[in-house]
Amino acid sequence: MKHSHLVAKNLVANERTSIHEALMMITDNQRGAIAVVDDDFVYRGMVSDGEIRRALVHGATQLAPISKIVNMNARTLRINEREKAETLFAEYPEVTLIPVLSKGNALEDIVVRDSSRRKT
């Protein structure tokens, strides 16, 4: 599987994943967020622990799919822009993951902030 390393590291979830499952993945990956994709691995957005918390406070259930709370305005890069990742991390200290997209918004990879420089 082309994207198995992203799935294995709990950095990406299908849009039908429940809020509860997403929160478990975010806890496991220790990055505060996950990328969200459809069945064809087309990028749909990001879900952070903050989005989950706000959704639960506003009455969402843990069984609701993350497609209901996905942030479609998260920072992304195109394949030919990977070198800009460090600049984005410096400009946006709250960002821990940057999805790398190809033509048609297919998720190709995720750049992960160096944990030694993670926002505290």
Predicted regions and their residues:
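Cysteine-rich, disulfide-stabilized extracellular repeat modules
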Residues: 9, 43, 62-65, 107
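Short beta-to-alpha loop/turn elements within the nucleotide-binding domains of ABC transporters
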Residues: 17, 47, 64
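Phosphate-coordinating loops and pocket residues in cytosolic domains that bind phosphorylated ligands
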Residues: 57-58, 71
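Short beta->alpha transition motifs characteristic of CBS
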Residues: 28-31, 35, 42-57, 99, ...
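Bateman (tandem CBS) regulatory domains
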Residues: 1-11, 64-74
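The conserved cystathionine-beta-synthase
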Residues: 12-31, 37, 56, 75-95, ...
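Short, flexible segments with low predicted structural confidence
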Residues: 24, 40-41, 61
